[in-house]
Protein backbone atom coordinates (compact mmCIF):
# COMPACT_ATOMS: atom_id res chain seq x y z
CA UNK A 1 0.00 0.00 0.00
CA UNK A 2 2.77 2.50 0.79
CA UNK A 3 4.42 1.92 -2.58
CA UNK A 4 1.10 2.63 -4.33
CA UNK A 5 0.73 5.84 -2.32
CA UNK A 6 4.27 6.89 -3.29
CA UNK A 7 3.50 6.30 -6.96
CA UNK A 8 0.29 8.35 -6.72
CA UNK A 9 2.20 11.21 -5.09
CA UNK A 10 4.19 11.62 -8.29
CA UNK A 11 0.97 12.64 -10.07
CA UNK A 12 0.00 15.41 -7.65
CA UNK A 13 0.51 18.76 -9.36
CA UNK A 14 0.89 20.78 -6.15
CA UNK A 15 4.57 20.08 -5.38
CA UNK A 16 4.41 21.49 -1.83
CA UNK A 17 1.51 19.18 -1.02
CA UNK A 18 3.27 16.28 -2.73
CA UNK A 19 6.45 16.88 -0.71
CA UNK A 20 4.55 17.08 2.59
CA UNK A 21 2.63 13.90 1.87
CA UNK A 22 5.83 12.18 0.76
CA UNK A 23 7.44 13.09 4.10
CA UNK A 24 4.43 11.61 5.91
CA UNK A 25 4.71 8.38 3.92
CA UNK A 26 8.45 8.19 4.66
CA UNK A 27 7.77 8.69 8.35
CA UNK A 28 5.14 5.94 8.23
CA UNK A 29 7.64 3.59 6.55
CA UNK A 30 10.26 4.41 9.16
CA UNK A 31 7.75 3.75 11.94
CA UNK A 32 6.71 0.39 10.52
CA UNK A 33 10.29 -0.70 9.88
CA UNK A 34 11.33 0.30 13.39
CA UNK A 35 8.51 -1.65 14.97
CA UNK A 36 9.05 -4.72 12.77
CA UNK A 37 12.76 -4.69 13.57
CA UNK A 38 11.99 -4.53 17.31
CA UNK A 39 9.37 -7.29 17.14
CA UNK A 40 11.73 -9.55 15.18
CA UNK A 41 14.66 -9.09 17.59
CA UNK A 42 12.47 -9.45 20.65
CA UNK A 43 11.18 -12.84 19.59
CA UNK A 44 14.48 -14.25 18.32
CA UNK A 45 17.18 -12.98 20.68
CA UNK A 46 18.24 -15.24 23.54
CA UNK A 47 19.44 -14.04 26.94
CA UNK A 48 23.18 -14.11 27.52
CA UNK A 49 25.66 -12.98 30.15
CA UNK A 50 27.54 -9.79 29.29
CA UNK A 51 29.37 -6.90 30.94
CA UNK A 52 26.78 -4.12 30.95
CA UNK A 53 29.43 -1.47 31.78
CA UNK A 54 31.33 -2.48 28.65
CA UNK A 55 28.10 -2.39 26.62
CA UNK A 56 27.44 1.18 27.83
CA UNK A 57 31.03 2.23 27.05
CA UNK A 58 30.83 0.73 23.54
CA UNK A 59 27.44 2.37 22.95
CA UNK A 60 28.79 5.77 24.01
CA UNK A 61 31.89 5.42 21.82
CA UNK A 62 29.77 5.72 18.66
CA UNK A 63 28.85 9.28 19.67
CA UNK A 64 32.04 11.04 18.64
CA UNK A 65 32.44 14.73 19.51
CA UNK A 66 29.57 14.61 22.01
CA UNK A 67 29.99 15.53 25.66
CA UNK A 68 29.04 12.24 27.33
CA UNK A 69 30.49 11.25 30.68
CA UNK A 70 30.44 7.65 31.93
CA UNK A 71 32.94 6.66 34.54
CA UNK A 72 32.80 3.00 35.40
CA UNK A 73 35.83 0.85 35.98
CA UNK A 74 33.81 -2.00 37.43
CA UNK A 75 32.78 -5.01 35.45
CA UNK A 76 29.08 -5.77 36.00
CA UNK A 77 27.89 -9.04 34.53
CA UNK A 78 24.21 -8.95 33.61
CA UNK A 79 22.04 -11.63 32.02
CA UNK A 80 19.67 -10.35 29.36
CA UNK A 81 19.14 -9.76 25.67
CA UNK A 82 22.21 -7.70 24.88
CA UNK A 83 21.09 -6.18 21.56
CA UNK A 84 17.76 -5.10 23.01
CA UNK A 85 19.45 -3.48 26.01
CA UNK A 86 21.82 -1.70 23.58
CA UNK A 87 18.84 -0.50 21.56
CA UNK A 88 17.15 0.83 24.69
CA UNK A 89 20.30 2.71 25.73
CA UNK A 90 20.68 4.09 22.20
CA UNK A 91 17.12 5.46 22.32
CA UNK A 92 17.72 7.30 25.58
CA UNK A 93 21.21 8.54 24.69
CA UNK A 94 19.97 9.73 21.27
CA UNK A 95 17.21 11.73 22.99
CA UNK A 96 19.64 13.16 25.56
CA UNK A 97 21.99 14.33 22.81
CA UNK A 98 19.12 15.60 20.68
CA UNK A 99 17.86 17.87 23.47
CA UNK A 100 20.97 18.56 25.55
CA UNK A 101 24.65 19.36 25.19
CA UNK A 102 25.91 17.41 28.20
CA UNK A 103 25.02 13.84 29.12
CA UNK A 104 26.07 11.93 32.24
CA UNK A 105 25.55 8.18 32.65
CA UNK A 106 25.92 6.26 35.90
CA UNK A 107 25.46 2.64 36.84
CA UNK A 108 24.99 1.28 40.35
CA UNK A 109 24.84 -2.33 41.37
CA UNK A 110 22.59 -3.03 44.34
CA UNK A 111 21.86 -6.31 46.12
CA UNK A 112 18.92 -7.21 43.90
CA UNK A 113 18.95 -4.65 41.16
CA UNK A 114 21.00 -2.62 38.76
CA UNK A 115 20.27 1.09 38.26
CA UNK A 116 21.35 3.03 35.18
CA UNK A 117 20.76 6.78 35.13
CA UNK A 118 21.06 9.02 32.10
CA UNK A 119 21.03 12.76 32.82
CA UNK A 120 21.04 15.63 30.34
CA UNK A 121 20.98 19.41 30.47
CA UNK A 122 18.26 19.85 27.85
CA UNK A 123 14.86 21.49 28.37
CA UNK A 124 13.47 18.38 30.08
CA UNK A 125 9.89 17.17 29.92
CA UNK A 126 6.96 18.46 31.94
CA UNK A 127 6.17 16.08 34.80
CA UNK A 128 2.58 15.67 33.58
CA UNK A 129 3.96 14.11 30.36
CA UNK A 130 6.25 11.54 32.04
CA UNK A 131 3.81 8.63 31.65
CA UNK A 132 2.60 9.66 28.20
CA UNK A 133 6.05 9.51 26.56
CA UNK A 134 6.03 5.72 26.95
CA UNK A 135 2.79 5.38 24.97
CA UNK A 136 3.26 4.27 21.34
CA UNK A 137 3.19 7.11 18.79
CA UNK A 138 3.12 9.81 21.49
CA UNK A 139 5.00 12.94 20.52
CA UNK A 140 5.86 15.74 22.88
CA UNK A 141 4.28 19.07 22.14
CA UNK A 142 6.01 21.12 19.43
CA UNK A 143 6.70 23.96 21.88
CA UNK A 144 9.58 21.88 23.22
CA UNK A 145 11.45 23.00 20.15
CA UNK A 146 11.72 19.64 18.46
CA UNK A 147 12.37 20.33 14.82
CA UNK A 148 13.65 16.82 14.12
CA UNK A 149 11.34 14.13 12.86
CA UNK A 150 10.23 11.57 15.40
CA UNK A 151 7.99 8.59 14.98
CA UNK A 152 6.99 8.40 18.62
CA UNK A 153 8.01 4.77 19.15
CA UNK A 154 11.51 5.00 20.65
CA UNK A 155 10.49 5.53 24.27
CA UNK A 156 7.68 2.99 23.99
CA UNK A 157 10.03 0.35 22.60
CA UNK A 158 12.67 1.16 25.25
CA UNK A 159 10.04 0.74 27.98
CA UNK A 160 8.89 -2.59 26.50
CA UNK A 161 12.51 -3.81 26.43
CA UNK A 162 13.09 -2.95 30.09
CA UNK A 163 9.74 -4.42 31.16
CA UNK A 164 10.51 -7.63 29.25
CA UNK A 165 13.62 -7.91 31.46
CA UNK A 166 11.50 -7.45 34.61
CA UNK A 167 12.60 -3.85 35.12
CA UNK A 168 11.10 -0.38 35.04
CA UNK A 169 11.90 3.14 33.90
CA UNK A 170 11.22 6.37 35.75
CA UNK A 171 11.65 9.92 34.51
CA UNK A 172 12.71 12.70 36.86
CA UNK A 173 14.15 16.20 36.85
CA UNK A 174 17.92 15.93 36.40
CA UNK A 175 20.55 17.59 38.58
CA UNK A 176 21.74 19.03 35.24
CA UNK A 177 18.30 20.74 34.96
CA UNK A 178 17.19 18.54 32.07
CA UNK A 179 15.74 15.05 32.18
CA UNK A 180 16.89 12.05 34.18
CA UNK A 181 16.03 8.57 32.94
CA UNK A 182 16.32 5.99 35.72
CA UNK A 183 16.39 2.38 34.50
CA UNK A 184 16.08 -0.31 37.15
CA UNK A 185 16.74 -3.94 36.26
CA UNK A 186 16.57 -7.01 38.52
CA UNK A 187 19.99 -8.45 39.16
Task: Tell me what each language-model feature is.
Residues 120:
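Acidic ATP/Mg2+-coordinating residue in the GHKL
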Residues 166-167:
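Conserved glycine-rich
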Residues 69-80, 108:
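Conserved catalytic submotifs in the C-terminal HATPase_c
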Residues 154, 158:
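Short alpha-helical Gxxx[C/S/T] motif in the catalytic ATP-binding
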Residues 102-112:
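Short beta-strand/loop element within the Bergerat-fold HATPase_c
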Residues 125-138:
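Short conserved segment of the HATPase_c
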Residues 17-65:
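Conserved DHp (HisKA) dimerization/phosphotransfer helix of two-component histidine kinases, i.e.
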Amino acid sequence: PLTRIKLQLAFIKDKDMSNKLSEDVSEMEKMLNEYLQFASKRSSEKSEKFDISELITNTINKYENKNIIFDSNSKIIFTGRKNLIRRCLNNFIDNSIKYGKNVVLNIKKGLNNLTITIDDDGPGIEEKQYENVFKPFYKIDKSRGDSKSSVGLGMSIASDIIQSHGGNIKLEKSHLNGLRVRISLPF
